[in-house]
Amino acid sequence: MAEDKGVKNMLEHLVKNLLVEDVEEIELRNVTIELDELELDLKTVAQTLPVEIWERILKPEVEEKEREVEVPEYEPPVEEYEGCVAEVQIGATRSDGGSRDRVVVLGGERAYFPFEEPRPNPPVVTFDVFDTPDVGIPGPIREELGDVIEDPVDWARTVVKRYGVDIVTVHLVSTSPKLHDAPVEEAMETLEDILDAVKVPIIVGGSGDPEKDVEVFVKAAEVCEGERVMLSSINEDMDFERVVEAAKEHGHVVLTFAPVDVNLMKSLNKKVLNRGLSKEDVVMDPTTCALGYGIEYTIDVMTRIRLAALKGDEHLQMPISSGSTNAWAAREAWMKEESWGPREYRGPLWEAVTATTVALCGADLLMMFHPWAVQVVMEAMEYMAEGRVTGDAYVTDVIA
């Protein structure tokens, strides 16, 4: 035991001197230590060191200096494109032979990303108006608009004055054989009344019936001569050539429609151009699938169309329209389900997110339905165009 204690004392003495005298290495010569087990307790030694020794040990010999890190300037990858999107004007002022107090210009993009080149014409919101309320208007929209939906003229006048939209879409759905089968002449009277009531550009929509819509559009082209309306929409399943001829004769724009397919969209556009319309007379709708109901397909198709246009495909170099109102086809937008939250908020949020998403993918015209969603998206489009918000773009503020 005495020998073990002596060895321990010797080792403690050596370690202490090692720390105190800054000895980095110690060499023992002609020393033999035979032990079954060796345990060094440095805490005992460390506790005996004076404060000044600890300061000397812990203080670095060379103080670290703050190093200035050079951050390279970030330059986003800017591509140059050989093609561009045509500019399409909807509406005509008195100087153009019409009676509108403004026009709307769509398209004109020369780049895909705004950091490559800002969009010359920001996306435009058009408010949907129906010539009859018997079309299954969602409850939240009925509650917000009130009695104006009973009169399409009052409806159009209200959305222009109250919500400040620059263009209105008039859907003549009463002409549908499956609804009221209203005569074309009766629908034209409604259209003329709306043209007199509001002075913003007008989009003329049909009922979706491929035969009746041709008659509606041909007559509307005649009635609206000089006003440069957009006839919405034509597709491969109808006698679209008659509509194209009427639009060409009376100076209007046509909206081509294809069901989420780039090749079908391109094929229809090519046929329309071959009939004599120019790219400046055509807007295309590749179909908008609602948020949660296939919007990823719409994102893919719109992105591919826009990139193809910028790369030089002349049959896809037209502005893109989005039926963002389709968001209301999602049951999450309108169904009464307490666990989903109040539907009066859900619906407009669903529509606003759908519209904003497609706008980021290249959509130039956003057809919308709920006033709150319209206000939010109009503010968002202004932010996209100018990089700032001039009003309250927050949904909660709009709702309040």
Curated annotation (Swiss-Prot):
Instruction: Tell me where the signal peptide lies.
Output: none
Picking any one GO biological process from the record gives: one-carbon metabolic process
Q: Which SUPFAM superfamilies match?
A: Dihydropteroate synthetase-like
Name the domain of life this protein comes from: Archaea
Q: Which PANTHER family match?
A: ACETYL-COA DECARBONYLASE_SYNTHASE COMPLEX SUBUNIT DELTA (PTHR36214:SF5), PTHR36214
Kindly state the subunit structure of this protein.
Heterodimer of delta and gamma chains. The ACDS complex is made up of alpha, epsilon, beta, gamma and delta chains with a probable stoichiometry of (alpha(2)epsilon(2))(4)-beta(8)-(gamma(1)delta(1))(8).
The family note in this entry says: Belongs to the CdhD family.
Q: What does this protein do?
A: Part of a complex that catalyzes the reversible cleavage of acetyl-CoA, allowing autotrophic growth from CO(2). Probably maintains the overall quaternary structure of the ACDS complex.
Looking up NCBIfam families in the UniProt record yields: cdhD, PRK04452.1-1
This protein's name: Acetyl-CoA decarbonylase/synthase complex subunit delta
Q: Which organism is it from?
A: Methanopyrus kandleri (strain AV19 / DSM 6324 / JCM 9639 / NBRC 100938)
Q: Which gene encodes it?
A: cdhD
